[in-house]
Amino acid sequence: MKRTMLLIASMTLALLMVAGMALAQDGVRKVCDTNCNGTDGDDHLIGTANPNTIRGLKGADLIEGKARHDTLYGGAGGDAVYGGSGEDETYGGGGNDYVDGGYGEDYIATGSGNDTVAARDGFEDQIYCGDGYDRVYVNRIDVLHDCEKKLTNKPQP
């Protein structure tokens, strides 16, 4: 009986990974080949060289997009979202988030909370700050919308 259950569980996980959907467990580091959803806990979700769509959901998540065009959602909780290289879309969500678009022309939206945005990469980024007191570290070419504090020195994550 145990072997049958283990076989079924292994096959189910393999099918989910082949379909490009990976499930993260609380406190577990998870590599997401294409699309990935976190849990209600604190997740560490990592993209690959493929374009990724990663959703942290609840919890204080660490999300890394890596290469190419990634779409990253922090969700509820104080998240750290890193776009990596490529033209990324990064969304902080609710909570006090740290959002770094990475290298490339990025779209960054913080959501509610007192957020910190890092966009000093030499590319023109579009940055939309939400409710709360947001600090953004930018280049002169970045375009800001509703951001409370603009800084040009390097942020400390």
Question: Which residues does each PLM region occupy?
Answer:
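Alpha-helical transmembrane bundles and membrane-interface segments of multipass inner-membrane proteins
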Residues: Q25-D26, D40-G41, Y98, Y107, ...
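Glycine-centered beta-turn/loop sites at beta-strand termini
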Residues: N37-G38, G47, G56, E64-G65, ...
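Leucine-rich solenoid repeat scaffolds
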Residues: A118-P157
